[in-house]
């Protein structure tokens, strides 16, 4: 089960947070996140597929076209909570920003995602 949850977190940064096509992103959101999932960023609480998709669109549209999110350390799962340390920057180059996602899982999907930005 831990491997499956870790894989969900990795798929989230690849198929949701690095996806610039909102239609493809929505398909990934529905597969990875619970229907009533909530995204927590500093100063923001965003709930539901449409609102999360809009937030990710604003995020990726503000990044250079060659930027992607990548996993920097192995995902750690502790019971029903996961941690993923990520980097953001040009593919195959050192990240220009780093952060961490904390996910709470419910029924095999991400129910809540807490995003922490380091730089």
What are these regions (language model features)?
Residues 12, 35, 39, 86, ...:
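A near-ubiquitous, low-amplitude feature marking generic local secondary-structure context
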Residues 26-78:
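A solvent-exposed, acidic/Ser-Thr-rich amphipathic alpha-helical stretch
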Residues 15-19, 43-46, 90:
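Short histidine/acidic/glycine/proline-rich micro-motifs that form metal-
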Residues 4, 57-119:
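A beta-strand edge to alpha-helix "cap/lid" segment located at domain peripheries
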Residues 2-35:
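Short acidic-aromatic low-complexity motifs
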């Amino acid at each position: 089960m831990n491997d499956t949850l870790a894989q969900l977190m990795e798929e989230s940064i690849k198929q949701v947070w690095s996806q610039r096509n909102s239609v493809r992103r929505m398909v990934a959101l529905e597969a990875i996140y619970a229907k009533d999932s909530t995204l927590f960023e500093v100063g923001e609480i965003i709930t539901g597929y449409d609102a999360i998709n809009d937030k990710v669109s604003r995020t990726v549209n503000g990044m250079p076209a060659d930027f992607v999110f990548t996993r920097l350390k192995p995902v750690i799962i502790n019971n029903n909570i996961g941690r993923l340390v990520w980097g953001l920057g040009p593919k195959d180059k050192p990240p220009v920003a780093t952060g961490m996602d904390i996910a709470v899982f419910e029924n095999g999907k991400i129910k809540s995602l807490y995003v922490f930005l380091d730089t």
